[in-house]
Amino acid sequence: PAGILNVHPRLSPEARNTITIENDENSWGIDASLELGHKLALVLDIHHHWVKTGEYIQPTDDRFSRIVDSWRGVRPVIHYSVSREDILIDHDVNTLPNMDELLDQGYKKQKLRAHSDYMWNNAVNDWALSFNDIADIMVESKAKNLASIKLFESTNK
């Protein structure tokens, strides 16, 4: 965050008003991103956060409120993806994956962070969609728009 804060004043006003910062599972998480919220809009990537911490952050979490506030009146965006379906082959589609249990079973975070083709886990979809009243959800998947359409259609049944 310090490097970004250092260069931020040298950016044009147009650049300062369009840059967003996203948490990730390697460089920095939500707490480090929040150090930038007074200058830049923050994008919450809920999958990155889960991979980094094992936590299913909730829309009522104070950190998410601070992320929303960083958008200064504009509807925020969150990023949503789920671990690949060919990694969690036997996982129940109606159960949230438990990071501690997966690690105990020998799964590696590097594999769990890879994006799936589609949003195959109903429980994870329900969790992600709990943010929909507050933020736009950008689906990150291998099937791109097809995955977004299928997710949207699943909410209208």
Regions found by a protein language model. Give the residues of each.
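Active-site acidic/histidine proton-transfer and metal-coordination neighborhood
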Residues: 1-41
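Short acidic, Gly/Ser-rich segments with clustered Asp/Glu that frequently serve as metal-coordination loops
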Residues: 26-28, 47-53
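Histidine-acidic metal/acid-base catalytic patches
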Residues: 40, 51-157
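Conserved mid-sequence domains
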Residues: 41-47
